[in-house]
């Protein structure tokens, strides 16, 4: 069965490529050679679908040789009592260090460009 992609991931992929082209223009048309994305567990993004969309959109373009690295960012919380940051393994947000329930979101909802490598023209 062929890999399916969603409109959500296609829209994100299009936005990523627009951002890469804008960065290239800011650097005098430097060629983008690698780009990294950090996608959070809670972002709602299907990573393999996003990868497929990116590869499909760059085929036969100036970005065809671009290498993408997609990093998964787990759902984490920070304890307000002891400052520990811990991965959430279920819906119970208790601190794994001290047991406090006074916690706040620390990560896992992000969707960001984490790095960019350019080759000057």
Where are these regions (language model features)?
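Long, charged N-terminal interaction/targeting segments
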Residues: 1-64
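Long, charge-rich boundary regions
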Residues: 2, 7, 112-121
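Short loop/turn motifs enriched for small/polar and acidic residues
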Residues: 38-42, 71-75, 116
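Short, flexible, mixed-charge glycine/proline-rich loop motifs
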Residues: 67-74, 84-90
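Cys/His-enriched microdomains
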Residues: 77, 93, 111
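Short cysteine-rich clusters marking metal-coordination/redox-active sites
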Residues: 79-82, 95-98
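Short functional micro-motifs and their immediate structural scaffolds
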Residues: 87, 103-104
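Short linear interaction segments
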Residues: 107-108
């Amino acid at each position: 069965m062929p890999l399916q992609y969603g409109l959500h991931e296609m829209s994100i992929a299009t936005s990523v490529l627009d951002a890469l082209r804008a960065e290239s223009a800011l650097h005098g048309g430097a060629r983008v050679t690698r780009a990294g994305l950090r996608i959070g567990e809670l972002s709602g993004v299907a990573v393999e679908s996003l990868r497929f969309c990116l590869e499909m959109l760059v085929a036969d373009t100036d970005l065809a040789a671009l290498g993408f690295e997609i990093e998964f960012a787990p759902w984490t919380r920070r304890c307000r009592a002891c400052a520990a940051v811990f991965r959430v393994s279920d819906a119970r947000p208790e601190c794994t260090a001290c047991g406090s329930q006074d916690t706040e979101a620390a990560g896992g909802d992000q969707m960001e460009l984490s790095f960019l490598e350019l080759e000057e023209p």
